[in-house]
Every structure is written in structure tokens, then in C-alpha cells.
Amino acid sequence: MKNSNKLIASVVTLASVMALAACQSTNDNTKVISMKGDTISVSDFYNETKNTEVSQKAMLNLVISRVFEAQYGDKVSKKEVEKAYHKTAEQYGASFSAALAQSSLTPETFKRQIRSSKLVEYAVKEAAKKELTTQEYKKAYESYTPTMAVEMITLDNDETAKSVLEELKAEGADFTAIAKEKTTTPEKKVTYKFDSGAINVPTDVVKAASSLNEGGISDVISVLDPTSYQKKFYIVKVTKKAEKKSDWQEYKKRLKAIIIAEKSKDMNFQNKVIANALDKANVKIKDKAFANILAQYANLGQKTKAASESSTTSESSKAAEENPSESEQTQTSSAEEPTETEAQTQEPAAQ
């Protein structure tokens, strides 16, 4: 949640400003602060804060939140939001209220942020489903490792982890016994089962296990815990690996989940989905102070790309009309020398 807190805090900062402005929208000169010889109006406050980096980021989040609420609002239920909220509360335990307060959040503002995140998440997953081609399935199958049974030791510092690894390498070492003695996990849990698409096990641990043969033991694997921001250290031993079937369709359901999960984590893919939603909403920036907040989504949306291509074609046509001789010369030159794309296409034939 610490990552989320940083993001949410920025959202709340400007959301509060915008809420204040909205409440006083009938008169931007409404006074919110008075003092001897001076006053501060809603307009003063808005103009003072709108150019800050926090406000820029917060306005972007506010726009995205409104756009996705309008387009996907019926896809996320109150029950889902409540469930996610309580899960986070349980993870933080007694410190949850303090964590909210530190981020200038109330339970309701945090729930609104959860809802916005889930709306984007839904849209991304729906877009990912449209990418489920046979080629994508086969690509996912190539890197897929079926269920593995592993024993895993979790440790809190590098020095201890290296010492434990040396102990495991000693002749006759009993991995299971050492694991149960040394691991720092609750209830001394050391046995796990997962495949290469597991999301409840650190990615680097999954990769290490996937690369091992039965009986193989990994080196020390260092992983930054995204919740505590503390490093954890893992050592894994693969005790059994399921044989991989030759037909990818045997794993189609699982591969589908993996493909969707991977695309959902892909920031470029996420940005394209957001860009398309912004295009569909026909978002227009009215205040030049926020002119660049959507720059990262420029030319990613379908409409934006089409408009850009149309503009390029139009400009090229106009240039050709104004300089016919230059256009003819360009065409002649193009006919004599293959374009970069043509050259790339021709290379395999020459091999």
C-alpha cells in the first residue's frame, strides 16, 4: 500500500482543491480565507497550486478517474471495493488508520482510489482478452513451466542467507530440516507448489525454480518486498517437476490467465488502453497550465494515431502540390532505392 499511498496522496491533494473549486463554482472570487487587509479566494488558491508537480499528477489521475467511471462504472461493484479495502486494512493491522492519516486519506477517499484502480484494471483485462491469438498462446507455451513442487527458505538478510546456502551445500545436508529450522515464514512453512505463471510468489523466485532440474538448489535470490520495502532472501530446491505436455492447448486456460496477467502488468499496454479511453471521451484541456498532462498518451490511442497519420498524409499531399518537381524527384529516388521496410523484407531472401 505504500506505493499506493504516494499516488493516492497526490490525487487527494488536487482532488481537495478541485472539490473546493466545484463547491464554489458560482463565483471563483468567493473568499476562503480572510485576514487584515487581504483575502484569499478560490481562484487565488487554484492559481497558486495548479502549476505544481503534485497538482499536475493529481489532475491526470482525476481525469483518468472520471473517464473510466463514465465508460466502465457499472463493471466494478461496491462489494469488490469493500473487499479490497478490508484486505489492505488486514495487511496493515493496527497501523492502518495511521497509514491512512499519514497519506491525508480517509476510508472513503481511499475507497474511491481503489475503485478508480479497479476500473482501469477491468479495462486493461478486457483489452488483453482481445490479444489472445494462437500466436500469443504458442509464445506463452514456449516459456511455460508446469507445476513444480519446491521447498523454499525465506531469510531476512544476505549474510545469513549465504551462510545457510553453504550449510545446504555440505555433504549429506538435509534441505528440509535446515529449511524448517532457518526459514522466517509464519508457521515455518517451506513446501510450495506453483507453475511459471504464479503471481503469489516473487517473480525472481519463480524464474529460478523454473530453470532448475529436479533436485536442483538455487543460489541466494534477493527480492525487494513491495509492501515493506525491505529485502527478502530466498533459497529454493525443486523436489518435483510435472512433465510438460507437447500440445499447448492442454494448458489453454492457464496460458490465457498468464497472458492476461502479463499484459495487465505491461505499462505500455496499460497506457494504450488509457489512451483509447481518453480518445473515446474526447478529453480537451481548457487550462493551459495542464496542457501537457496527457503527453505520455499522445499517439497511443487509435483515434489519435489515425488523426496523426491523416495529418501526415495531408501535409505530404500539400507539399507535393506546392513542389511537384521535388515530389517527382522523391518518387524517382524511392523507386531506385528500397525503403527500410522493403530492405528488411528482402534480406531473408538473400540469405
UniProtKB/Swiss-Prot annotation:
One Gene Ontology MF term: peptidyl-prolyl cis-trans isomerase activity
Lipid-modified sites (N-palmitoyl cysteine): 23
Superkingdom as given in the UniProt entry: Bacteria
Disordered: annotated segments: 303-351
Topological category with respect to the lipid bilayer: Lipid-anchor
Places the protein is found: Cell membrane
GO cellular-component term (any): plasma membrane
EC number(s) given by UniProt: 5.2.1.8
Lipid modification (S-diacylglycerol cysteine), residues: 23
Biased composition (Low complexity): 303-317, 326-351
A GO BP annotation: protein folding
Keywords of the record: Cell membrane, Isomerase, Lipoprotein, Membrane, Palmitate, Rotamase, Signal
Position of the signal peptide: 1-22
Catalytic activity: [protein]-peptidylproline (omega=180) = [protein]-peptidylproline (omega=0)
Disulfide cross-links: none
Chief location bin: membrane
Domain PpiC stretches: 145-240
UniProt similarity note: Belongs to the PrsA family.
Function: Plays a major role in protein secretion by helping the post-translocational extracellular folding of several secreted proteins.
Entry protein name: Foldase protein PrsA 1
Underlying gene: prsA1
